[in-house]
């Protein structure tokens, strides 16, 4: 999204998405480091090709909000599994991500 916005001369939009991209990389590192700290193996699977063009910034932000809601559902599912398994360490780690998703959705919603 950042590259598409940049190509369209939308530097502010491009920067917003670039900052989000960097933040998502940090989140991935937190998950990977946590998995390693639990003496488990991190498996990185191939990522499917992603969309690279949008009709407008509004469409970009709408897609972003939709995606963030999907991520929220996945994190909530992980939190439910951790609670059910009485995995308190994972539950504790996931609290930060639950809170973070509230902010992520709000940030995308604010841009719409």
Describe each model-derived feature in a short phrase.
Residues 1, 33-34, 49-112:
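Acidic/histidine-rich alpha-helical segments that form the ligand environment
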Residues 2-46, 108:
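Conserved alpha-helical segments that form or flank metal/cofactor-binding pockets of metalloenzymes
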